[in-house]
Amino acid sequence: MLDVNLFDELRIGLATADDIRRWSHGEVKKPETINYRTLKPEKDGLFCERIFGPTRDWECACGKYKRVRYKGIVCERCGVEVTKSKVRRERMGHIELAAPVTHIWYFKGVPSRLGYLLDLAPKDLEKIIYFAANIITSVDEEARHTDQETLEADIFMEKKEVEADRDEELAERQQKLEEDLKELESNGAKADAKRKVQNAAEREMRHIRERAEREIDRLDEIWNTFIKLAPKQMIVDETIYSELVDRYEDYFTGGMGAEAIQTLIKNFDLEAEAEKLSEVIRDGKGQKQVRALKRLRVVAAFLRSGNDPAAMVLDAIPVIPPELRPMVQLDGGRFATSDLNDLYRRVINRNNRLKRMIDLGAPEIIVNNEKRMLQESVDALFDNGRRGRPVTGPGNRPLKSLSDLLKGKQGRFRQNLLGKRVDYSGRSVIIVGPQLKLHQCGLPKLMALELFKPFVMKRLVEKSYAQNIRSAKRMVERQRPEVWDVLEEAIAEHPVMLNRAPTLHRLGIQAFEPVLVEGKAIQLHPLACEAFNADFDGDQMAVHLPLSAEAQAEARVLMLASNNILSPASGKPLAMPRLDMVTGLYFLTLEKSEDQLGGEGAYHEADENGPKRGTYSSFAEALMARDRGVLGLQAPIEVRISHLRPPEDIEAELFPDGWQRGQKWTAHTTLGRIMFNELLPWNYPFVNGVMAKKAQAVIINDLAARYPMITVAQTVDKMKDAGFYWATRSCVTISMDDVLVLPNKEEILQRYEKQAATIEKKLARGKINNEERYRSLVDLWKECTDFVGESVEKIYPDDNPIPMIVKSGAAGNMRQIWTLAGMKGMVTNSRGDYITRPIKTSFREGLSVLEYFNNSHGSRKGLADTALRTADSGYLTRRLVDVAQDVIVREDDCGTRKGLEVDVAKPVLDAEGNETGEFTRAEFLETALIGRYLAKDAVNDNGDVIYERGAFVGDAEAKKMVAEGVRTATVRTVMMCETATGVCATCYGRSMATGQKVDIGEAVGIVAAQSIGEPGTQLTMRTFHQGGVGGDITGGLPRVQELFEARVPKNQAPIASTEGTIKLEDDGNFYTLTITPDNGEDEVVYEKLSKRQGLAVTQEPGGFEHQLRTGDHVVTGQPLLRGAPDPHEVLRVEGVTGVQKHLIEQVQKVYRDQGVAIHDKHIEIIVRQMLRRLTVVDSGSTELLPGSLIDRNEARAINKAVATNGGEGAAFRQEIMGITKASLATESWLSAASFQETTRVLTDAAINKRSDKLIGLKENVIIGKLIPAGTGISRYRNISVEPTEEARAQAFSMNTSYGDGFYGEDGAYGEFTGAAVRLDDQGFDGGFGDIS
């Protein structure tokens, strides 16, 4: 087998017949497969052992040679080589065809490569190949010219003869007529009879004239056809062709079928054709030039690649190894076989029949029919169903051809090469494991024993529990008691990987240290649920075992759950307390002035009744008071603390030089809050407040920024334990009695009912139209719902469990409480329009039948939407991954000085709208600025340089930039990165998952695709209605797809191509809009702007909005109508930077509307890939073809090289490609073929003899190589670790001191190094005396 590590690129080309014969181990001559009695392969058949190798290891077919000692011998009796049966997976055969056939991919593909090469229309080509027309392959122009006069004279003579014959026949007929008339006259016949005879004679004479005329016309046609005869001329009329052959076969050759095509290709001069086409492209125009360009692409591909175009017509076809198209016996003696065997059988049958016919000298028409059938059977083998009806098997099922084996989800690429099943894995239901640490998971004993079986067996032998592996295996299978002890040792420090499908982002697989548990369910840490999106309602998870030391190290260092606390999409913590844990911590940190457990221990100021109470000298004393039942958990107290760091304000006041552990300070807090702070690192500033979910998130975010991951992991683990502990003790439960109903709800409803009746009356009287009624009712009932809801909120006491759950942030929101206790309110129908009758009851009261029916509309729509969304979102993720899979961090810094301008601070305005001199953060600072490097100095209004170019901007730096008044900053971005392949670490900035600068080798493209695709399911599917004005506005997932596919949006909005003042004119259903540019250039006129779509809205300085009107000022790129601009138009008007900003803003808008945080850099990576390609406009001195696509970096390199040699560089136009198109246009043919349109990609790659440089991830996965990312990157491959002196000393330090005479004093053998010492060097000869 070929070692994948021995080559760096993979090339695909066209195989010629000689190549096919060279690969082959013999010709398959018979259609038989195996003998039905002996079940042995038939000789020369599709499973022949002589061709493909023996079916049994080291045994020939006849049994003369058996055993490995005869290895390599070819049996003289049966001709089978003695070798391993595995060769039946590798050895190919071939079928010698009796007539050439064309390869269907090159003829039927779009565009038809054969058609472009030979300049024939695909329809004509089809007629020739399938024997419906003849084609002229060559003409002897010279001989024809020489003999033209003679031949013309011959034709002239022939015509004369035809005319003479005609005249003779007419004369005879005339004579006969006269005689007949005479006879009739003599017999006294009537005039009627004479007329009949006369008419009949005239009719006959007319036929004679017409026949002669036809004959002369035919001769003229034959002659004219012959005179104009040229190669590649098609003759459909069979009779004319046979006449031409009969008369002039010495002057031309022609034919039909693939044979004629083969002759044409062999006579084809590629270089001359390329020159001719280049001339047409230079001088031509319009359609002619376009076609010449397309043809030149195919001709140039053959010229450049050195492929032989004749290879598109096959004289022999390969037969793939039999093990790849197996035949297996079923119970009952029947056989199941691969479809390919049927298809090969058809080819062989027809081929043999054709050979026999040719040998017998059968008539041409029969032979041609058989050749056509052979061509069709080879077509079916290569790509069944591509032309005509597919060949079907039993049950009318189309047979799977070679192309079908590669295509689609079940094809070779996606099913077997990109997605393999792996050994050492198991799956089971998951349950919660609250007792686990974050880096642990509970593994059922039986599953662990099965997974670690080999490790356990090895240890059993090592520990002498078993003599050999076989007995160890028996012990394991019988589950002897010692097996469990050994299993404990085997799993120690050996991480396992847990995966939950669907794996939407990289945190869908994480590593954990296994802990053995009883039962059969896997136990999962509660904090890991968020990342896996797991819950415990029957979800299943898969366990995988990393085997090699490297795999274990990577699992532990990179994938361990405690190292993956932050989300790679936004940098926010994912391992966060949720649900019950949040409630518990919220309950713990509440403050109640009078606590349930008695308030004597609570803090009271000194008053006339006595001194102040509730002050404690330490946390321990306060705890003791609680244990005695004097102090409540949530009662306010004053306490002196020395083991926890004070809040920042107190520290600044009391300890200007910084607080040291042990220094005392006084806190006004509650016991619960001190307990909460005990969970945090001791040197984290004391947090004195109620810990709702958002506050907890802020703390964990801060911890992640300040402390190592291990500390954060330990802290969240403690928070988890405390959360569950106090949630249990908080007694938060929900019962029907906790849902309080509004006492005066009926009155409120009656008030609004009256207003609704008034609106209905207005409609009946014609004061308002239907549209206005709808809007008024919707607004009215929404107001009613809100009023009822807010009233409900007020009647709930603080200690009611329902608002407590909501306020803590554990689950739900206030609207759900309104629905429970107030009223459900407005619901939508399946079209998304509101039903104007609201649901007036709450779930506590129960819905009426009609209300329930109305409610079910929208709910059902929601469920259907979710199902559709999941599939759509998955497909979007797949396309994103495909387009970005080769974006890997390749170097530290590309050195570019370009960057993207982002807003940092905006001025604070006073009541009059003037700047106050203070600044506040720009709106999207987190996702745009933080985590990047500066491309230019950050300067404020005074010109002070706050941070220099190259500085990193984290949270603290961003804060300072805002405070100093830096309005905008130019940051490094992947879109401007100049790294040849992939991106550089400086342009990418901080890895969101680690908070550090991204490592070289990080597959940032995949992370970006997952970050955008993973929240895809949360996006809505809906189109927003704009009440008829702007039609529908696409939102949610469809909008994201529209943007990433660079589609022209529905209801496209034209954009201003220049800056200036507008003038509007009304033209009935349309507007005409004229822009007068500020720079004095010609006016720009936009005609036929739809009124239905509506004019765009513009903002006035005061923040008010209005529709565009005459006199308004517009800037370049501003939309003129409602709707979304076309990205291609934005690129044309605003250039690359404009379209980059447009795409990022628009995608972010959709995600922000759903409350999803994604850093801009992820979207930028996808946008970079969309703008990677340029179109060649003018080739200059380069070899490039106008109209061809080229990678931006490659274009830069080519122009640089040409300029060095003094040539003229090519001119390019920037293209924006949708992600699907961009994936298919990738340099890697393996990656493109495994994505979509497999046959088209492979056809194109083969003609161009494409070479895949194996740069991306997919192509390396496909060929089974380590991916060039992470630890698989070349620079990390051959690292050898040299221990430092300190490490060596640490590893081998030994503190034991023997100090006895036998071993000598310490130091007698020098410093201890851990190296073995030869005893005879030390004077020992092994004579230790008699030890017995």
From Swiss-Prot:
Gene3D superfamilies for this protein: 1.10.132.30, 1.10.150.390, 1.10.1790.20, 1.10.40.90, 2.40.40.20, 2.40.50.100, RNA polymerase II, clamp domain, RNA polymerase Rpb1, domain 3
One GO CC annotation: DNA-directed RNA polymerase complex
GO MF terms, alphabetically ordered: DNA binding; DNA-directed RNA polymerase activity; magnesium ion binding; zinc ion binding
EC number of the protein: 2.7.7.6
Entry coiled-coil feature ranges: none
EC class of the enzyme, as a word: transferase
Keywords attached to this entry: DNA-directed RNA polymerase, Magnesium, Metal-binding, Nucleotidyltransferase, Transcription, Transferase, Zinc
Reactions listed under catalytic activity: RNA(n) + a ribonucleoside 5'-triphosphate = RNA(n+1) + diphosphate
Protein name (database record): DNA-directed RNA polymerase subunit beta'
Name of the encoding gene: rpoC
